[in-house]
Amino acid sequence: MKKIILLLLIVIALAAGGVYWMKAGNPNALRHIVLDQCVPNQIQNRNPAPCAQVKTDAGYVVFKDRNGPLQYLLMPTYRINGTESPLLTEAHTPNFFWLAWQSRSFMTLKHGSEVPDSAISLTINSPTGRTQNHFHIHISCLRPDVREKLNAAQGEISTQWLPLPGGLEGHEYLARRVTENELVQRSPFMMLAEELPEARDHMGRFALAMAQQSDGSFVLLATERNLLTLNRASAEELQDHQCTILK
């Protein structure tokens, strides 16, 4: 009984710490940058600064994150909080994951030489795994150890959401194989909500990641928040913003 009480106290402390961390900074900083700076500057002056790109017609911007030499963020030009937003499973919402993958070229431009697709990953964190309240997909390098595990498990990843053997970074992950054609036609948010019963009404519990495999297919990864196992559902843990994989 004492162990259970101690565990609950640890979970409560971690949850409280996460809330404090989010409130300690400005959780709306990215939203202000997009809505009050990038979009108006593009419309008025045809200059996306401080963003790297503004696509008002397509509904997104690309912004260079200060964390890491090659990390970029893809964000909508309108208010969407994150994985918990019902807008992400509506047909009219842009396919942000596919748009983020198409924006990976900014990494190569910044790097000055080609960044191979095998080194690139996309992630979005859950509400408990993020510090900003404006929807943003991290476009950055994949951790080398995660790359190795995905390579080793390539033959075991199917077209259904199934547990990835051994998990990643100490947390349980579901993996699903998708083709490029599937990814173009259907958002990973829709795939998760429509194919995983427990996710349909609780999308905010999940974080998502994506990487390309050696055969040209993509692997989608989803992890669900579980404070009992100290999992805040922060898929960004699979990324290395210092890009060791390129060295």
Swiss-Prot record:
GO terms for cellular component: plasma membrane. GO terms for biological process: CDP-diacylglycerol catabolic process; phospholipid biosynthetic process. Pathway: Phospholipid metabolism; CDP-diacylglycerol degradation; phosphatidate from CDP-diacylglycerol: step 1/1. Gene3D superfamilies: HIT family - CDH-like (3.30.428.30). It is an enzyme of class 3 (hydrolase). It is found in: Cell inner membrane. It holds the Pfam family CDH. InterPro entries: CDP-diacylglyc_Pase (IPR003763), CDP-diacylglyc_Pase_proteobac (IPR015993), HIT-like_sf (IPR036265). It catalyses: a CDP-1,2-diacyl-sn-glycerol + H2O = a 1,2-diacyl-sn-glycero-3-phosphate + CMP + 2 H(+). GO terms for molecular function: CDP-diacylglycerol diphosphatase activity. Keywords: Cell inner membrane, Cell membrane, Hydrolase, Lipid biosynthesis, Lipid metabolism, Membrane, Phospholipid biosynthesis, Phospholipid metabolism, Transmembrane, Transmembrane helix. It is a single-pass membrane protein. The chain crosses the membrane at residues 4-24. Belongs to the Cdh family. This is CDP-diacylglycerol pyrophosphatase.
